[in-house]
Amino acid sequence: MNGSRATNAALLATLKAEWSEGSDVSVCVPAPYLGETAAALDGSGIQWGGQDCSAHSSGAYTGEISAAMLAEFGCTHVIVGHSERRSMHGESDALVADKAAMAMASGLVPIVCVGETLSEHDAGDTDAVVIRQLDAVIFKLGAAIERCVVAYEPVWAIGTGKTASPQQAQAVHARLRALLCSASTFGDSIRILYGGSVKVDNAAELFAQADIDGGLVGGASLKAADFVAICRAAR
């Protein structure tokens, strides 16, 4: 829940001016700014998406935003299961899977987030947690999981002063890759993004890992120069 009309306009203008082809970029913005984002990025080659969607197609769900509504604004992607949604809104694995299915039904690519908390990490439960979370989506979608993007967010490495090394991140990505390959013949081509405090100074080493296909960039995306540099590192 960051940004304003003025700061967003400046950020998007810089991104559009400085971005060049070589990496796929999707900017997921707060819903009130979707119209302005679509206008700003139209024809640029940069895609845009939503930060969440409802598990329902329509109806009396005041305050929720359907995947179909996002699609009407030209969105190509939507984030589901972000760690903040799971922790602050109590979203279950099953609900996240339902949201992913609804996104796909509306022609969007769901960016499915998985990741363990600090206590789960310290208890050695990383594998069990991320596999459980991703398994719920695979169970719901079946082989259609190949149309998703997966994002690994080590929650313990976000705002805690602790960091996941590229090697630690790669180890988890490799386990997620193995699970995806067991569910789809296209498992090797499903993109797995890393979302644990991606910054200019660690992006290149992270993206050099075999199973890290890009980044789910948080705070660094609020600074246009940093975000452009990270996008360049993903080429």
Feature map (PLM): residue ranges:
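Active-site loop-to-helix "anion-binding N-cap" substructures in soluble metabolic enzymes
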Residues: M1-R235
